[in-house]
Curated annotation (Swiss-Prot):
GO terms for molecular function: rRNA (cytosine-N4-)-methyltransferase activity. Transmembrane segments: none annotated. This is Ribosomal RNA small subunit methyltransferase H. It is found in: Cytoplasm. SUPFAM superfamilies: Putative methyltransferase TM0872, insert domain (SSF81799), S-adenosyl-L-methionine-dependent methyltransferases (SSF53335). It catalyses: cytidine(1402) in 16S rRNA + S-adenosyl-L-methionine = N(4)-methylcytidine(1402) in 16S rRNA + S-adenosyl-L-homocysteine + H(+). Signal peptide: none annotated. GO terms for cellular component: cytoplasm. The keyword Ubl conjugation does not apply. Keywords: Cytoplasm, Methyltransferase, rRNA processing, S-adenosyl-L-methionine, Transferase. GO terms for biological process: rRNA base methylation.
């Protein structure tokens, strides 16, 4: 299997500035090739925090775990690399904390959502409409259902709902009809290029083809990996793990993710003033968190020129109050 390379971590300087502010336990819930984790460890070392700090890296991709282990080998005494989904972040932190005999509250958590360049650039993973490969899209290769399973078993109505809900694709009905027609005439759709061709034939405007392909492939990937369901859980569990002044940093890449992150951060940073019209002088419950980034942080021109895939990245940060 050809393995893609891991790009430079997105918004690395901004992550370090906003996340690494004190010694303690840090969690990289989306370890990938280890780029962000290495930067965090080096920043902890530069600030003199490393001796009193520890980093837990989580990923469900064996290739990512191998790459990260090699990249972080110089900090092996200060890291634990765990195979798993970040939906289990609370259990993983508790387990490592018990084994290492340190507190299970954390100073910082980073979640870099979406697909890594290595996954996109590896044809056998089936994430990209630009590469010929099996229609897979599983971030955990051992997971049961692939994108091909969805494309070949869902009804037309279910496909329409999927593409509209998770891809926000306006031509969902036409594309779903195209898939059903193909299945009836040719059988199963098993390759990325087969699905891409069906989509191209259903998009009348050439200038919209790339966006349509992106939306449909995104919708399938989100469903295969239960991305929004998992994100909802990890946001809640991650926030609950933070120590006083600890921070949760999330990098999102599409509007569905960003809206969910923004909504969660807003809810967590809002005090409870009870029903309208009660006229309380103090809230029933004060907010336990504060939003650090009133507007999401985006990549600058220099980063965009070096890594065009960072163009849609948005960084939001939440802090646990004392």
């Amino acid at each position: 299997m050809g393995i893609g390379s891991y790009h430079e971590p997105v918004l690395a300087a901004e992550v370090l500035q906003l996340l690494v502010r004190m010694p303690g336990v840090y969690v990289d819930g989306t370890l990938g090739g280890g780029g962000h984790s290495l930067a965090i460890l080096e920043e902890l070392e530069r600030k003199g925090f490393l001796a009193d700090s520890f980093l837990i890296g989580i990923d469900q991709d064996d290739h990512a775990l191998k790459a990260a282990s090699e990249k972080l080998s110089g900090f092996s005494g200060s890291t634990a690399i765990i195979k798993g989904n970040f939906s289990a972040i609370a259990a993983i932190v508790r387990k490592i904390s018990a084994e290492r005999h340190f507190t299970d509250s954390v100073a910082g958590i980073l979640l870099d959502l979406g697909v890594s360049s290595a996954q996109i650039d590896t044809p056998e993973r089936g994430f990209s409409y630009m590469r010929s490969g099996p229609l897979d899209m599983r971030m955990d290769p051992e997971a049961e259902s692939s994108a091909a399973d969805l494309v070949n078993t869902l009804s037309e109505r279910e496909l329409v709902t999927l593409f509209f809900r998770y891809g926000e694709e306006p031509r969902s009905r036409s594309i779903a009809r195209g898939i059903i027609d193909y299945r009836e005439k040719h059988g199963s759709i098993l390759r990325t290029e087969e699905l891409a061709e069906i989509i191209r034939l259903r998009e009348a405007r050439p200038d919209r083809v790339i966006k349509t392909l992106s939306r449909v492939f995104q919708a399938l990937r989100v469903e295969v990996n239960r991305e929004l369901e998992v994100l909802e859980q990890v946001l809640a569990d991650g926030a609950s793990l933070l120590s006083a002044q600890g921070r949760l940093a999330v990098i999102s890449y599409h509007s569905l993710e960003d809206r969910m992150v923004k909504s969660f951060f807003t809810a967590q940073s809002s005090s409870d003033w009870g029903p309208r019209g009660v006229g309380l002088t103090e809230p029933l419950k004060k907010a336990e968190f504060a939003v650090v980034t009133r507007k999401p942080v985006a990549s600058g021109q220099q980063e965009l020129s070096l890594n065009p895939r960072s163009r849609s990245a948005k960084l939001r940060v939440l802090e646990k109050l004392a």
